[in-house]
Amino acid sequence: MQGFISQVLGPVVDVDFNDYLPQINEAIVVNFESEGKKHKLVLEVAAHLGDNRVRTIAMDMTDGLVRGLKAEALGAPISVPVGEKVLGRIFNVTGDLIDEGEEIPFDKKWAIHRDPPAFEDQSTKSEIFETGIKVVDLLAPYAKGGKVGLFGGAGVGKTVIIMELIHNVAFKHSGYSVFAGVGERTREGNDLYNEMKESNVLDKVALCYGQMNEPPGARNRIALTGLTMAEYFRDEMGLDVLMFIDNIFRFSQSGSEMSALLGRIPSAVGYQPTLASEMGKFQERITSTKKGSITSVQAVYVPADDLTDPAPATVFAHLDATTVLNRAIAEKGIYPAVDPLDSTSRMLDPNIIGEEHYKVARGVQSVLQKYKDLQDIIAILGMDELSEEDKLVVERARKIEKFLSQPFFVAEVFTGSPGKYINLEDTIAGFKGILEGKYDHLPENAFYMVGNIDEAIAKAETLREISRGDTCLDNCKVEQKKAN
């Protein structure tokens, strides 16, 4: 099944065959030499041009490629390694190792183009995916097998939340994670790898990188490479897998570039006419089955903060929850800096999460919203001008704000505080107590960076003892001065 290259137009390569026509999405391999080095280039069939000629998209740079070079059709789509051997390693779009580790043979490989699970195999139960992070589980819970949009600028803690989720899935759910860097900066990918190494979560995650400098084919298909690895863990091993995609916008962007290179007429704002169907095909594979689930957290870049842009707007249609990180909250020193009022979830429904959880979550949001509304009055007139009822709202809101923070396992290295995983029942009980006024007598500092409410009570006692000790010390100094 050999052919030869008839045309090279950047990342688009035309290949002619004599008596064979490769199918759409079939892989074609070209082995060639350039500047004294041997190269292996993988192409993917994108269109049939007639007369046994196919138009392909290259998965790597086409520098050094010339007309007339032999090309071999593999008779199948790009296949990538799957199974436990992929954990702790970095792969490119074609499933080759790109880290500094030793080369190992992979006995299992799956094609990256797959159908979503059959309807009868899918699980229709609405279940919460417990993360152990208070603010997420209480106010914007994730659906098992659902899709979460992670919104946040640089430096507000996206990577730390991603690593904490990977840690909690590994150690509390005995599950694995897959990270797909779609159009990532090489430096960011490198930083993430090193941080995971330091945080001891690397052996529970497979990393797939299609970096920013790579052709659009690689940046687009890397999402499918990562998803295929996650599907194996779900379908063959029956696990609940967490899949991270950073950034899902780059998936649409690279698809738009590929579409333009293939000569298709663009749609709105220059995007590919098949944007919605491509996104739908990809997102439909991320689901729960009766065996296991893939829950995905997708970082979403919004170009020029325009939520009506077709790329983010297409993603929103598929999301079950949004986790919004807020710089103003991070500046207060409250981590994770998740915005409790902006973050949403379709799971926040009394029929799914139960009446008690729903009432507590809405109560917390109501108190925080009232506090937000009162902030202008406090800034101009001060706390003394508020009614007694409003003062109580402010006090409880500040305690809630502090209690929404928690120490992370992966941040132990630089905070010195041991990480905490908080069960949903403990989270609900703690916030319910604050709303009911059970802990009005405790200082607000007692609620900062603790796990459950018992730890807040213990911290309040410790603060009281420190305060008593300081008072005693001051009294001793006064007595000493009098004696002198």
Curated annotation (Swiss-Prot):
Bilayer disposition of the protein: Peripheral membrane protein
Chief localization: membrane
Location of this chain's protein in the cell: Cell inner membrane
Enzyme Commission number, as recorded: 7.1.2.2
Keyword Ion transport (UniProt): yes
Stored Pfam families: ATP-synt_ab, ATP-synt_ab_N, ATP-synt_VA_C
Transmembrane segments: none
Keywords of this entry: ATP synthesis, ATP-binding, Cell inner membrane, Cell membrane, CF(1), Hydrogen ion transport, Ion transport, Membrane, Nucleotide-binding, Translocase, Transport
GO cellular component, one term: proton-transporting ATP synthase complex
Binding of ATP, residues: 152-159
Signal peptide feature range: none
Reaction(s) this enzyme catalyzes, per UniProt: ATP + H2O + 4 H(+)(in) = ADP + phosphate + 5 H(+)(out)
EC primary class: translocase
MF terms in GO: ATP binding; ATP hydrolysis activity; proton-transporting ATP synthase activity, rotational mechanism
Gene3D superfamilies per record: 2.40.10.170, Bovine Mitochondrial F1-atpase, Atp Synthase Beta Chain, Chain D, domain 3, P-loop containing nucleotide triphosphate hydrolases
The keyword Nucleotide-binding is annotated on this UniProt entry: yes
Record text on subunit structure and interactions: F-type ATPases have 2 components, CF(1) - the catalytic core - and CF(0) - the membrane proton channel. CF(1) has five subunits: alpha(3), beta(3), gamma(1), delta(1), epsilon(1). CF(0) has three main subunits: a(1), b(2) and c(9-12). The alpha and beta chains form an alternating ring which encloses part of the gamma chain. CF(1) is attached to CF(0) by a central stalk formed by the gamma and epsilon chains, while a peripheral stalk is formed by the delta and b chains.
Family recorded in the similarity comment: Belongs to the ATPase alpha/beta chains family.
Known role: Produces ATP from ADP in the presence of a proton gradient across the membrane. The catalytic sites are hosted primarily by the beta subunits.
Protein name in the entry: ATP synthase subunit beta
Record organism: Campylobacter jejuni subsp. doylei (strain ATCC BAA-1458 / RM4099 / 269.97)
